[in-house]
Regions:
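Class I S-adenosyl-L-methionine-dependent methyltransferase catalytic core
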Residues: 1-167
Length: 167
């Protein structure tokens, strides 16, 4: 179904250990954010601002509560909209150093989002994109979009794919 899957704590830990050195004074876009755990973790590890995009009202409420609990509201913007409308709204207004997305598996949504990002003005030049996807997800199209897969971290049932903009 389309329900949100929590990214497990271990996965989250691994993810942030892999990018920890870079989380400085930067901006983080959390797409299909679910509970907001990833974006909130990013803020707590030094990101200047995180933008959360989520369409599900229950998930939005969860993000708001988690931000309140962690007292990180000042560094967060929550957009309740589908990802593509949100990207259009942000395009030209904001640039991101990190984009994390955890789309529903097996709907090819990551490809649609990456295709949009490739022609948008949303990415800083050394931006890192991280996609959480099922192990079967095909990423062979990345190079045509001008992206480079730098790393794949496989877990039991899913993986994190680290993508950069080609120089």
């Amino acid at each position: 179904g389309m329900e949100t899957r929590p990214t497990t704590d271990r996965t989250k830990e691994t993810l942030f250990n892999m990018i920890a050195h870079g989380l400085c004074d930067c901006t983080f876009l959390d797409l299909f954010s679910g509970s907001g755990a990833i974006g909130i973790e990013a803020i707590s590890r030094g990101v200047k601002k995180a933008v959360f995009v989520e369409n599900n009202p229950n998930a939005i409420q969860c993000i708001m509560e988690n931000l309140k609990k962690t007292q990180l509201e000042d560094q967060a913007e929550v957009i309740r909209e589908d990802v593509f409308s949100a990207l259009r709204r942000l395009d030209g207004r904001e640039k991101f150093d990190y984009v994390f997305m955890d789309p529903p598996y097996n709907h090819m949504l990551e490809k649609e989002v990456l295709t949009y990002l490739a022609k948008s003005d949303l990415l800083e030049k050394d931006a890192l994109i991280i996609v959480e996807a099922s192990l079967a997800t095909d990423f062979s199209y990345l190079e045509e979009l001008g992206f480079l897969m730098i790393k794949q971290k496989k877990y039991k049932t899913n993986m994190h794919v680290f993508i950069s903009v080609e120089e």
